[in-house]
Amino acid sequence: LILRKGEKMALLHYPKKVVLGDITVRDGFQHEEKFIPTDAKLWLAEELILAGFKRLEVTNFGNPKVMPQFKDADMLSKRLHASKKVGHLLKDVEITAITIRERAVERTIEARKEGYGPDRILFMVSTSESHHRTNSGLSLDDYWKMCETYIPKAHDAGMKVCGTVSTIWGCPIEGPTELKKAVEFTRRWLDIGADDIEHADH
């Protein structure tokens, strides 16, 4: 950084503390060809909580025919909440589940009613239309409309909502993407009620 005479460097206001999260149980296993046993997923989730992680992404409530790795989403969530090892710690841990489409959100709402649903769900848009349609099956316009409908429903069920913006640096289908779209989508998430934002480069 080169400063010219008379210029001042902007002060960066770093937070005094951060909260560490882990997404291995969901993202780490998502593309594994073989099904990871529920016992193994539960063990890892418990160990991560015992290690001190306060935010954990544990599963995807999407269509198990499309995402067979997460056909145990309900069972894993039930067992985690009933865990003798970490059940008493869950009040201080935020559990997140992926919910790309409507049915996934409805499943988490049902799970909340039964006492084992996540604390937070995650929606995802891409700055690339092609990537977004491949990921969700909807156009960006239709997806935003869906989220505007389902964010209030999630809040009514007691869940926080994360709005993720993907392909902020580039798209495997379209190539380079415009960063201004990521900024625009971030603002849009906040405008429609998302509680927090994640940015992803995939």
Model-inferred region functions:
Residues L1-K8:
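Short, Lys/Arg-enriched N-terminal segments with co-localized hydrophobic residues
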Residues A10-E33, L122-N135, D156-I173:
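N-terminal small/glycine-rich loop or linker at the start of catalytic domains
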Residues I100-E114:
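Catalytic cores of alpha/beta
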Residues V66-A97, D142-C162, R187:
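Alpha-helix-loop-beta-strand connector modules within alpha/beta enzyme cores
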Residues G28, L48, T108, I121, ...:
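Conserved, mostly hydrophobic/aromatic
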Residues I23-L42, E94-R103, R133-L140, T167-K181:
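Active-site mouth loops of central-metabolism enzymes
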Residues Y14-V58, Q69-A73:
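Conserved N-terminal beta1-alpha1 strand-loop-helix module at the mouth
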Residues K54-L80, F123-L138, W169-I173, D196-H202:
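Glycine-rich, proline-tolerant flexible connector loops at the mouths of alpha/beta enzymes
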